[in-house]
Amino acid sequence: MEKIVVKGGTPLIGEVQVSGAKNAALPILAAGLLATEGTSKFYNVPKLSDIKTIGLLFESLGVKVDYKPEENTLEMDARKPLLTEASFEFVSKMRASFLVLGPMLAREGSAKVAMPGGCSIGSRPIDQHLKGFEALGATIIQDAGFVEARAEKELEGTTIFFDFPSVGGTQNVIMASCLAKGKTTIVNAAQEPEIEDMINFLIKMGAKIEGKGTSVLVIEGVEKLVGTEYTVMPDRVEAATYMIAAAATKGDVLVKGAPYKDNVALVSKMREMGVNIEVVDETSMRVSNKLDSLRPVDVKTLPHPGFLTDMQSIMCVLTLLADGTSTITETVFENRFMHVEELRRMNAKIRIEGRSSLIEGLPHLEGTTVRATDLRSGAALVIAGLMATGITKVIDIYHIDRGYVDIEEKMRKLGADIQRIDE
C-alpha cells in the first residue's frame, strides 16, 4: 500500500509551478463532446487519475482519445455519433463524469448515465442539473442507480432559475443549451473561474454565450460546434495548497500559476492572519511567513466569489498556528470535517459544533499515521506533517492522486523531507 511519509520541521523555500486545474479540465473535456466537426487538443491538462478515467469513459462512448500525461496534452475526436449510455464503471469513480449527460443529450437526444461518485464529503445532489434539462424539454427517468434523459424533439431554450448556484448544474445546462433551439437564460448561475474557463472554450468552438463571470448567463443555441485548441487554467486549489504550506512551515515560496483574481478570498483571509503575500504579476504570488504565531480568523465557505469549500480543510491546518481560537463554518457540504479526527490524532485541539469547527491554535503537533479521507483532507494532512514534530505517515493517498500532480516531488524541490513509499 502506497503512503506519503513526511518528516516535519523544514520551511518550504523556492518556487513551484501549479498544474492545470482538474476542476476546469474535466468540464472542458466534457464540452469537447459537443464538437461534431474537427478535433480538439487541450494543453496544460494535469497528469491525474481522474483525467485518465474520463478519457476511458469517452472511449466507451465512441470518442477517439489521445492522452499524453507527460506532455500535459489530450486530443479528442468526437465527430462520430456518441453512444448514449455512460458506464457505471467510470461514472461511479468520479463525480465529474456526470457532466457527459448534457453534451450527450444535446447531441443525440438521449443519455443514460450512472449516478455520480467521487469523494465522500456529503450529499451533492443533481436536482439542479435535472431541473435544467427538464426545462429545456427533456424527460427525466431515475431508476436503479441511473439517470436517463430523453428529448423527443429538439431542446428548446427557456429561462432556468437555479435554487442555488450549482457548479455542476451550471456547467451541464450550459453545454446542453449550446445546441438548443433559441435562447436560454440561466439565473443564479454559479460564477466560479472554472466555469468561465469552460465558457471561454465553448465560445472558441463557436458557442454564443453572454454574461460570463456573472450570475445570469444567456446562451443562444447554434447549429454546430467545431473542435479547437485550448489551454486549461491553473489549479487554484493546488495554488492554495502551496501558499498555505509555505505559510504553515514559516517558509518563502513563489507560487507560479496563482492569479490573484482567482484567489481573492483566500489571500484576504491569509493576510488577515498576518501572512505576507506579494502579488508578483498576473499569474504569480509570493508567500512568506516569519511569525511564530498568527492571528485567529473566522472563515465561512460560500459559492464564488466567497471562500472556496475545497480550501477549508487546508485552511484549517494554517489556523493551528494562530494564537487563539479560529472558526471555520462549512455552508456548502454537510460532511466536510473528516480531516478533524485525523488532525486530533496529531494532537490538534479542534471541536465540531454544528456546521462549524473551532480550532485552538498553537498545539504541539506530533507525527503519527493518519488517513486521507478525501482529496483535500489528504493535502491538509501532508501540510500538517510538514508542521509536526517527528514522522507523519499519510495512508489512502489514492485520494490525493485524484487532484494533485506529483505533490511529494514538488514539495521536495521546496526543501520538504517527504517521500512516497510502498509497503
Model-identified regions with their sequence ranges:
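Short, structured segments at the rim of ligand-binding sites
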Residues: M1-E423
